[in-house]
């Protein structure tokens, strides 16, 4: 892959309007309380891709597309076990989701909505859980779209 071809997309991302819209801790808190659902949503989509494109099972069978297998597994590895540092500065491994929750706690954002949602997912399943009123509307819309992709 020619990495220079990504420069326009990188510039576009670096100049995204979101970076001019968040001007205070209060605005960051609101953003994070919404965005955490997208962080979780991405993992759900990624795990679906892993399940469909990099099937796991026993007995193991070779996958003819090694590049795709590596690409998906590298993303999963980073998302599920990225480097983090504990309060003593020691290296630990944890998910991006957990790193995000830790950052939310650091700025004073509430994790109640996402934690309640995930508890409902575990106890009642995704379809009942996503009717939770505490999910911000834009997050609900994103998750509905992702679940449609996952189920089809």
Segments (PLM) and residue ranges:
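Active-site-proximal alpha-helical scaffolds that flank and shape metal-associated catalytic sites
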Residues: 70, 74-152
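Alpha-helical bundle segments that constitute or directly flank the non-heme di-iron/ferroxidase center
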Residues: 1-13, 23-61, 74, 78-83
């Amino acid at each position: 892959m020619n990495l220079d071809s990504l420069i326009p997309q990188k510039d576009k991302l670096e100049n995204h309007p979101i970076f001019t819209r968040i001007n205070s801790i209060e605005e960051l808190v609101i953003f994070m309380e919404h965005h955490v659902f997208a962080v979780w949503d991405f993992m759900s989509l990624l795990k679906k891709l892993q399940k469909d494109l990099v099937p796991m099972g026993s007995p193991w069978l070779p996958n003819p597309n090694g590049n795709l297998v590596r690409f998906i597994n590298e993303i999963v590895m980073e998302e599920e076990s990225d480097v983090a540092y504990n309060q003593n500065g020691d290296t630990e491994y944890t998910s991006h989701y957990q790193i995000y929750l830790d950052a939310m706690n650091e700025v004073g954002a509430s994790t109640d909505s996402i934690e309640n949602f995930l508890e409902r997912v575990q106890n009642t399943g995704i379809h009942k859980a996503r009717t939770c009123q505490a999910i911000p509307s834009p997050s609900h819309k994103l998750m509905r779209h992702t679940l449609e992709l996952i189920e089809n």
